[in-house]
Amino acid sequence: MANIKSAKKRIKVIKTKTLRNKIIKSSLKTTIKKFLAAVESGNVEEAKVSFTATVKALDMAASKGVIHKNKASRNKSKLALKLNKLTA
């Protein structure tokens, strides 16, 4: 356990940021799963709406530093390919 005041504060800050990151990652995974479920079911309209929400969530997670911007871009590209296969 830290004795220095600033170190104690850092521990508190790290806990809150870790919690925030877990919440964002969890909601991101849920959004991606909803999109994939819509693609699997073949529902084009639901997939398009879900894709928009997923892209927004990926961009938000990347801007907050929860995931790397390249990972977000890679995921968006992969999901866009799935959507294009469904609509084609």
From Swiss-Prot:
Molecular function, one GO term: small ribosomal subunit rRNA binding
Disulfide bonds: none
Domain of life: Bacteria
GO biological process, one term: translation
Residue intervals passing through the bilayer: none
Keyword annotations: Ribonucleoprotein, Ribosomal protein, RNA-binding, rRNA-binding
GO cellular component, one term: cytosol
HAMAP family membership: Ribosomal_bS20 (MF_00500)
Family, per entry: Belongs to the bacterial ribosomal protein bS20 family.
Function of the molecule: Binds directly to 16S ribosomal RNA.
UniProt protein name: Small ribosomal subunit protein bS20
Organism: Clostridium kluyveri (strain ATCC 8527 / DSM 555 / NBRC 12016 / NCIMB 10680 / K1)
